[in-house]
Amino acid sequence: VEKGDIKFVPERFTKNYINWMKGGRDWCISRQLWWGHQIPAWYCDDCGETVVAKSAPCTCPKCGSTKLTRDPDTLDTWFSSALWPFSTLGWPNEDSADLKYFYPTNTLVTGYDMIFSGLAYTGKAPFDTVCIHGIVRDSQGRKMSKSLGNGIDPLEVIAQYGADALRFMLVDGSTPGNDMRYIEKKVEAARNFANKLWNATRFVLMNLPEDFEPGLPCEELLDMSDKWVLTKLNQVAGAMTDNLEHYEMGLAAAKINSFIWDVYCDWFIEIAKPRLN
């Protein structure tokens, strides 16, 4: 990170990460979870010796006892996350075609509360960019927690508004590195946008000729409204591409929302209706 091999977006998190790595703070690595990498430690039932090993030991190295009990906890999921970029690509087989082609990867997207711990298994930086997003808070700006009872069940939201509405709300309201508030009205607005897009698509499909072939007709067949909407489309596509290249997903989502709703549906489709009739 200090050499610039890995960059953070937003850049201000570079200092946070370096300070965290140099701070040497104590860190509780164990978790009481059903799933995860179980801690590779065994305890001798007779003398209390702790044995750390890659595989289950047969005897205690101190007293020779065969009565060994494994630690029931799992490692913090940060360990799993650190292994993910290469463990999914065939590692530890370093001749894996996927590992050679895809590793190192490009981008890690993570929250600022999940600073990654790069483990030196491969000798290479696992990615060149770390995109930091905020956390989703409740409507009052509080962190969601079991103790406050303010958590949101995404399955209930999806059942009421649809998965696409929840996804779009989370993207549309995001800015790199900043928290956002969960507001149900925004999910409802995203649902309405999805319905608008569905209705626009249905209108187009109902009016397509049976022999329609996708493609742009020659310029002589385009009237002024066609050229206008295509110009707007190219403008928003260019602006969105720039946003996405700079990890500004929220701005990109806002642009597509505005184009579909304000330009395409409210203007172009209404202009096109008399021509189709």
Regions found by a protein language model. Name each.
Residues 1-209, 229-272, 276:
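Structured secondary-structure scaffolds
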